[in-house]
Amino acid sequence: KFELQPPPYPMDALEPHMSSRTFEFHWGKHHRAYVDNLNKQIDGTELDGKTLEDIILVTYNKGAPLPAFNNAAQAWNHQFFWESMKPNGGGEPSGELLELINRDFGSYDAFVKEFKAAAATQFGSGWAWLAYKPEEKKLALVKTPNAENPLVLGYTPLLTIDVWEHAYYLDFQNRRPDYISIFMEKLVSWEAVSSRLKAATA
């Protein structure tokens, strides 16, 4: 049985950029519902006892998702999203991460521009990701609709932003580009992204 994990900081820790009210609904209602519904769906099935990652890969079913896929992927995506942020985040990455960004996108500024564009142009609900492609040993930007994530493509997720309306509507209403800019400038945890890259390239 999966349990709803709290974000790695207090609910008001990302104020004023992400309000505790947003967390109350986004984590306390939406994320909780994905976990609760997943537990109901897998109870007593062959999926019971598998890791979240395994459930995602099995239920993706090569692009013809089985019923548990959406809740499993959304439970995973949200935990990953909370851990992609930190209080007093933003700034620029350093070390190997910055080297790969410069190599694969031309510059950090070019990467930010592309990431923001990917997040802003994801039509409807979904996610934008920085991912590592292990076969090519390269970074890539990925947009995914609804619950999908780069795991189903065989990529390693490094960073994500949630662009479902419930992620930003209480704080930014329909101003998705403003939310994306604040995420990159004030919230992103480059330490988390760097440690994920280190694990992916180990």
From Swiss-Prot:
Residues annotated to bind Fe cation: H26, H78, D162, H166
One GO CC term, this protein: chloroplast nucleoid
GO molecular function annotation: metal ion binding; superoxide dismutase activity
Catalytic reactions on record: 2 superoxide + 2 H(+) = H2O2 + O2
SUPFAM superfamilies: Fe,Mn superoxide dismutase (SOD), C-terminal domain, Fe,Mn superoxide dismutase (SOD), N-terminal domain
Domain of life from the UniProt record: Eukaryota
Cofactor(s) of this protein: Fe cation
Keyword terms: Chloroplast, Iron, Metal-binding, Oxidoreductase, Plastid
The keyword Protein biosynthesis is annotated on this UniProt entry: no
Pfam families cross-referenced by the UniProt entry: Sod_Fe_C, Sod_Fe_N
InterPro entries listed in its UniProt record: Mn/Fe_SOD, Mn/Fe_SOD_BS, Mn/Fe_SOD_C, Mn/Fe_SOD_N, Mn/Fe_SOD_N_sf, SOD_C_sf
Main location: plastid
Cofactor note: Binds 1 Fe cation per subunit.
EC main group: oxidoreductase
Compartment list: Plastid, Chloroplast
EC number: 1.15.1.1
Induction: By environmental conditions.
Described purpose of this protein according to its UniProt entry: Destroys superoxide anion radicals which are normally produced within the cells and which are toxic to biological systems.
Assembly: Homodimer.
Family recorded in the similarity comment: Belongs to the iron/manganese superoxide dismutase family.
Protein known as: Superoxide dismutase [Fe], chloroplastic
Native source species: Nicotiana plumbaginifolia (Leadwort-leaved tobacco)
